[in-house]
Amino acid sequence: MARIAGINIPDHKHAVIALTAIYGIGKTRSQAICAAAGIAEDVKIRELSEEQIDKLRDEVGKFTVEGDLRREVTLNIKRLLDLGCYRGLRHRRSLPVRGQRTKTNARTRKGPRKPIKK
């Protein structure tokens, strides 16, 4: 297994799909990384030489991924909470942040229903 950005990349998958195992890299970004590294998208990871894997590592290293990205997202949410702005309040109350309706939906964000005690 190739190790890129601290993650073991699956050998049996195509390069584009295998790179999406890294947090912060989706299909579009993985296609751009493969193109920049000069690697065909349909080549499997186990078929790549060590030089090609090093090129992939260099290209992935140009982006914020994995732990750094998770930390950045967490700090962004913490900043909103500290500011006390509307979005921060919505995060604090575990409600949808981006203007979705909450009268009927938003069960995922609000959690299971709480029965009303009489």
From Swiss-Prot:
GO CC terms of this entry: cytosol; small ribosomal subunit
GO molecular function (one): structural constituent of ribosome
Record Pfam families: Ribosomal_S13
Highest taxon of source: Bacteria
GO biological process: translation
Alphabetically ordered keywords of this record: Ribonucleoprotein, Ribosomal protein, RNA-binding, rRNA-binding, tRNA-binding
PROSITE patterns, A to Z: RIBOSOMAL_S13_1 (PS00646), RIBOSOMAL_S13_2 (PS50159)
Region described as Disordered: 94-118
The protein's role, per its UniProt record: Located at the top of the head of the 30S subunit, it contacts several helices of the 16S rRNA. In the 70S ribosome it contacts the 23S rRNA (bridge B1a) and protein L5 of the 50S subunit (bridge B1b), connecting the 2 subunits; these bridges are implicated in subunit movement. Contacts the tRNAs in the A and P-sites.
PANTHER family: 30S RIBOSOMAL PROTEIN S13/40S RIBOSOMAL PROTEIN S18 (PTHR10871), SMALL RIBOSOMAL SUBUNIT PROTEIN US13M (PTHR10871:SF1)
Family affiliation: Belongs to the universal ribosomal protein uS13 family.
Known partners and oligomeric status: Part of the 30S ribosomal subunit. Forms a loose heterodimer with protein S19. Forms two bridges to the 50S subunit in the 70S ribosome.
Name of the protein described by the UniProt record: Small ribosomal subunit protein uS13
